[in-house]
């Protein structure tokens, strides 16, 4: 099935800024807990979004590109910054854009893997299919062997979730019951 996303005349860097910032609220990765901004005289900025840290099974700390596929969502969950009633800038990647970003960050040694989550675009199945396409392309077309943590989309077809899970090193989810309990529509 061809799932294409309309081009909204937004650069990939603009999308990256919006979708890394929106992903920072997902607690699946760790951060330093420090909120020291870069002052322009030195290096580093601990509050900049985009790179998070996780730990491998053997205890190593690994850097991940932490992004949302989209921050658009059909739901209006009270707890979520990306709820449809929230007035925030919206953006969506294509599977190829996520692949290219991941590969470029990996080649530059900025990351060792990808953390990919998403708002729900059109329907849970539609969004899960886009995540599957992204991981499939990363693994098969781009031969990416780095670490991938993906968030399963609540309410998506279980076969889509299963197929996506085979391409990821780790998969997690928000329970569908939790999601529905916080809806306001």
Model-derived features: positions:
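Active-site beta-loop-alpha junctions enriched in small/polar residues
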Residues: 119-121, 151-155, 176
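Short, charged beta->alpha transition segments
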Residues: 65-67, 96-107
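Conserved small/polar residues in nucleotide/adenosyl-binding loops
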Residues: 177-185
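Hydrophobic faces of well-ordered beta-strands that scaffold small-molecule active sites
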Residues: 65, 114, 148-150, 171-173
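Canonical Radical SAM [4Fe-4S] cluster-binding loop centered on the CxxxCxxC motif
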Residues: 67-96
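Conserved glycine-rich "GG(E/T)P / GGGxP" loop and the immediately following alpha-helix
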Residues: 114-133
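Canonical radical SAM enzyme core domain
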Residues: 87-99, 125-130, 137-170
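Flexible, acidic/Gly-rich N-terminal and inter-domain linker regions that tether
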Residues: 1-72
